[in-house]
A protein has these predicted regions:
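Active-site residues of response regulator receiver
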Residues: 55
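Non-catalytic signal-transmission and effector/linker regions of two-component phosphorelay proteins
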Residues: 1-4
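Charged phosphotransfer/docking patches of two-component systems
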Residues: 10-14
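Conserved acidic carboxylate
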Residues: 7
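Alpha-helical interaction/dimerization surfaces of two-component signaling modules
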Residues: 19-23
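Acidic, metal-coordinating helix/loop segments flanking the phosphotransfer/catalytic sites
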Residues: 17, 32-51
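A generic structural motif
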Residues: 24-30
């Protein structure tokens, strides 16, 4: 499963990435973005996640 994490607090994003990697090793973090602009650019470039975590 491809996961996108959208979070402006770096520590929270890193904690989620670590937790997902530990509990669900089959999950692939395809991107971690910090803003709407960065996220929109990622999608415009062809990004296609299965699941999105936002503002956790």
């Amino acid at each position: 499963m491809k996961v996108l994490i959208i979070e402006d607090e770096t520590a929270a994003a890193l904690n989620l990435r670590s937790l997902l990697g530990h509990e669900f090793p089959e999950v692939e973090i395809v991107a971690m973005t910090e803003s709407i602009v960065e996220t929109a650019e990622w999608f415009a470039a062809g990004g296609s996640p299965d699941l999105v975590f936002m503002d956790i």
